[in-house]
């Protein structure tokens, strides 16, 4: 159980354990002859689907293109996500509403409300399992998106490099530089980010922040002796105090993860 969340230096404290990083670093341990791995990820560094607007949609569009999706398909996906969660039945230029979904072999209506889980994207026009979860050749969207509300934009102290690289004005070189420098010193203000990205800051500043997080996703995998294929569970928890937390998402099994030798 997480005892308390510490954002400084991207760390959290687990009960009975030392401080750990909350950037997806994989930790290992042993129970008798069996093994386990776990990692903790700060949700504030992901792109919040429920906070997506016509303006910030450019970030997911850039992310999709960077992941190998064709630009026209990315346009369809972004507009369709916005249509899926807005309250009306008017579709955007490349989007879809209930008239499209009701024409499918297994018809359903557009939700026209906030998303409850990232997996819900599989119901949105243009999204395929490969785009969402990735493949052996390509990364997917799943680990880069969230549905949990917060303020302050994408937290640049916690954002994966793929998310950083999708920000307007950000280049792969700048994303690598931000990712490297924040390991030694977290950014406390957007001016700190500006000292790294320079004149690109005004382009990305409407979409980012440095606010602390209280929501984390924990993925843990257990392995029997000499077996490489483990059993994985995943949970997203909101830390409400030093002794209280609330689970907002749980999945078991949560996909296969092979033990690294």
Model-predicted regions and their roles:
Residues 1-261:
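Compositionally biased linear targeting/interaction segments
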